Curated annotation (Swiss-Prot):
SUPFAM superfamilies assigned to the protein according to its UniProt record, in alphabetical order: P-loop containing nucleoside triphosphate hydrolases
Residues annotated as binding ATP: G13, P14, T15, A16, A17, G18, K19, T20
MF-aspect GO terms: ATP binding; tRNA dimethylallyltransferase activity
Protein name (database record): tRNA dimethylallyltransferase
Keywords, in A-Z order: ATP-binding, Magnesium, Nucleotide-binding, Transferase, tRNA processing
Role: Catalyzes the transfer of a dimethylallyl group onto the adenine at position 37 in tRNAs that read codons beginning with uridine, leading to the formation of N6-(dimethylallyl)adenosine (i(6)A).
HAMAP family documented for this protein: IPP_trans
Any single biological process term in GO: tRNA modification
Organism: Chromohalobacter salexigens (strain ATCC BAA-138 / DSM 3043 / CIP 106854 / NCIMB 13768 / 1H11)
Name of the gene encoding the protein in the UniProt record: miaA
Subunit comment: Monomer.
Binding site for substrate: T15, A16, A17, G18, K19, T20
Homology family: Belongs to the IPP transferase family.
Length: 312
């Protein structure tokens, strides 16, 4: 029996793989509309360090779910799921194809798998956990999470304060692991026929070279001034998800006089390479993904062939 669900394309890949360029080309070939799946591009005023599409690119191919939050605000995977589904329904209702593009794997997982029913935040408990984070350090709390919820600990970086504290909060409120609660939720059939593409260079050294080239281009384009403007606001701090974004955290520390320029660059590159490694690890475990070499001159033709084949 043929699948009658509307088509949606999911274009994933590590940072600096070239997803934006391919997505714009596919939008024109498929008659689609782009939806950003990037937890950094949601923030207004954070353009250079997030490699946000340029004004010219956005005029040619608008991206939904870009510039939807102030850097002082938070945005959960559950909120992303609600927003993305609404955008996908709107695009499909116009007879066009939703093209989701980005590398925030937690957003993608929550979009497809759904969001577990979790207890509401407990202000008193969160305050206590924040105090422990300050006194004991995030690494110590991550070790604790590894003992009580190894599944969640595997997916949460030790320095991702927001997600780390939330996982511990859920465990202390329910006595159950996040992974257990996720596994219990009923998985509904996703309303779209989803074609999943992973874009990445075949060689790691090629990706690392691109990461370095892009980081240096950001510095030349005024990344330092962009972060300085964020600091000058006075209401932002390094505990916020926006300021913890790769590159922003390292530049923030540099502007506070904690590191010199060379150290900032070295740490920024290291953090970006670590992010790319985590993204690739996650993608290798993704069921049914089609891998495309980002260096292939016919990458968009390969994707179109995969899409056409998925409908038969």
């Amino acid at each position: 029996m043929s699948d009658t669900r509307p088509l949606a394309l999911l274009l994933m890949g590590p940072t600096a793989a070239g997803k934006t360029d391919l997505a714009i080309a596919l939008r024109e070939r498929l008659g689609g509309e782009l939806i950003s799946v990037d937890s950094a591009m949601i923030y207004r005023g954070m353009d250079i360090g997030t490699a946000k599409p340029s004004a010219q690119e956005l005029a040619r191919a608008p991206h939904r779910l870009i510039d939807i939050r102030d850097p002082a605000e938070t945005y959960s995977a559950a909120e992303f799921r609600d927003d993305a589904l609404a955008e996908m329904r709107d695009i499909s209702s116009q007879g066009r194809t939703p093209i989701l593009v980005g590398g925030t794997m937690m957003y993608i997982k929550r979009l497809i798998d759904g969001v577990a029913s979790l207890p509401a935040r407990d202000p008193a408990l969160r305050e206590a956990l924040n105090a422990r984070a300050e006194s004991e350090g995030l690494v110590a709390l991550h070790r604790e999470l590894s003992r009580v919820d190894p599944v969640a600990a595997e997916t949460i970086h030790p320095h991702n304060r927001q997600r780390l504290l939330r996982a511990l909060e859920v465990y202390q409120l329910t006595g159950r692991a996040l992974g257990e609660l996720w596994a219990e939720q009923a998985r509904e059939t996703f309303p779209w026929r989803l074609v999943s593409i992973a874009l990445a260079p075949n060689a790691r050294h090629v990706l690392h070279a691109r990461i370095a080239e892009r980081f240096d281009s950001m510095l030349a384009a005024g990344f330092r001034d962009e972060v300085a403007a964020l600091q000058a606001r006075g209401d932002l701090h390094r505990g916020l998800p926006a300021i913890r974004c790769v590159g922003y955290r390292q530049m923030w520390e540099h502007l506070r006089g904690e590191t010199d320029a060379a150290t900032m660059r070295e740490r920024g590159l290291a953090a970006t390479r670590q992010l790319a490694k985590r993204q690739l690890t996650w993608l290798r475990g993704w069921e049914g993904v089609h891998w495309i070499d980002s260096d292939a001159s016919d990458a968009h033709e390969q994707v179109l062939k995969i899409v056409r084949g998925s409908s038969t």
